[in-house]
Amino acid sequence: MRLRRKSTLKRLAIIGLDCAEPSLLFERFASDLPTFTRLREQGVWGKLESVIPAITVPAWSCMMSGQDPGALGIYGFRNRFDYSYDRLITADGDAVTVPRLWDILSQHGKTSIVLNVPGTYPPRPLRGKMMSCFLTPDANAAYTYPPSLQVDLQAQFGDYPFDARDFRTPAKDRLLQQITTMTRTHFEVARYLAARNDWDFFVSVEIGLDRIHHAFWRYMDNTHRHYESNSPYADVIFEYYRLLDAEIASLLNVIGDDSAIMIVSDHGGQKMDGGICLNEWLIAEGYLTLAPPYSETPTKLQALNVDWTATKAWGEGGYYGRLFLNISGREPQGTVVPEHASALLNEISAKLSSLGNENGQPIQTRCFRPETLYPVANGIPPDLLIYFGNLAWRSIGTVGWNQIHLLENDTGPDDANHAQHGVLIFNFPGLQPHSEPLPGAHLLQIAPTVVDFFGLDIPETMRYPVLSAK
């Protein structure tokens, strides 16, 4: 059964929660989250598999377009600009060249309100209103369409907090206050715009949950290697989920009962056990060669003297690992013959997959080739995408540690990494409730489901089917 609306139902609202974790939302905290639980019990729900890589950028743009990272040519926050060794660019909204849901709906006369969706700075024209995302530099930037909306919001709410800046900080009290205030403001603005505008499609994404997970996971998880018992922050994540539950309830009161409601996340969250120093490992294995002088302190690879004539591969840090081959005829000083590239990637993948933790115990690292993930890989994809410990370990790109395993993050305190599955709740009047979770739902099914909800033809670029339930 396709999850289609009644003919009398005209509107759909998506509430996005960056990094919402199903084991917390559906299990551990569920009995204390009446709004989430009601929507779940009266609708369909389940885990939502993310794209690879399961990263905020590009996952939200993938969800809103129904196209994978290869089609977008976006493989993370920073992507190679060209085949030089050091030019990386941030993938903001200008990097997204495919139509997203509000673009498609605008073409069919539908009005959208788009708030805080990652990948929307700078904002673009649409039929409706848009406020850009956490990539907005500050409140002095042009962050709305139409521009007059910014004047209105500035008068009503003052400077808008797009993100909790510097969330990798030991100043936990300040950060918690910042995230809480930001989230309340986000929902206050969402209610204001939802109530004062006619719309067909509404989407708002809250980034605060991701920041809370990264900053406070160790205090609630007694399996975390840095768990602190009896911490004053033990209930911070729980209380934040309760805050979201209450704020969503207030937003739903404004939206009303005549709309379909979808709650989604771009990925889940899990404890982070540490980091794998990818470039240190490549040096130790003979794939990456540095020329003197050597760094005695952790340093970005781009700032070091790499002997590219003796280097076969290098990597980038982040929540997942990205490895690039130094291919002859592609990179300026390439050393790997193109015909040998596949065998070399197989060799490196096998070694990385067998790499254990600091005690040699298996961690289940997974390596992916872009040609096996995506029908088309636009832009410059990594030659290898690496999930260290299935994302329980992050990738460390800096060099100078003289070790492979780090038990802390190299860019500041960080307790959590992403997980491959986020959450999905879909609820609208007339929908038959499902007590069991919807199996096999994928992030790339969201866009075609929304297009289908409005009775429009699904674009051929959306390869995944509409969500369905038995």
Question: Locations of the language-model features?
Answer:
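C-terminal beta-strand edge segments of enzyme domains
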Residues: 420-422, 456-470
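Structural motif
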Residues: 14, 201-205, 262, 425
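Glycine- and acidic
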Residues: 21, 171-176, 226-236, 429-435
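Active-site-proximal alpha/beta segments of enzymes that process anionic O-linked groups
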Residues: 9, 22-199, 207-214, 446, ...
